[in-house]
Amino acid sequence: YFYRNKMEFSFSNARWLTQYEISSEENFGNKDALGFHIPGMWSKILDLQECFLQEAPSNDLRLAVRNYAIKNGLDFFDVRNQEGFLRTLMLRQNSQGEWMVLFQLYREEKENREQLFDYILEKFPQIKTLVYAINPKQNDSIYDLDVQTYFGEGFIYEEMDGLKFKIGPKSFFQTNYKQALNLYRKTLEFAEISENDVVYDLYT
């Protein structure tokens, strides 16, 4: 539990309903959701209330964003019609308890965006940097998008046995810090590297 340093969640105006909810024929009203995609149902999102994959305050932060957005009438993404405002939320942390928050927005709504960002920055002082990207594409890939920094430096740092890593919104970094550290240490042990050896990283 609580081993991942990076989690990505999707906004949707089509919350996944259980078979019980469907058979009840109740009118559920608001169907906005922030969470995970349902396997085999690309347009449906499981509205997460609690996730055991990432440390606190991940749950509180995600729910604060969700509840603020619903309360203030912000449009959750409609993947079928390709419209809406809020698209994805990425939460990333380092081992020092500092957080990066990344929003993907389908369109720009400057006033709504700034009010949402200011709200969570005030509520969660653990946030070291907050970044966002406008993504009107058909997919959620961020690598060809222009990421804007709203707060902080636009990245966080991680350290492993004297090595310092600069991690940005597009960076790949092992999602399990403790196991990555064990892996690096075991690799050094197997390699039997001395202080006089020259080491080449051929896979960067």
What are these regions (language model features)?
Residues 1-204:
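Accessory RNA-recognition modules of RNA-modification enzymes
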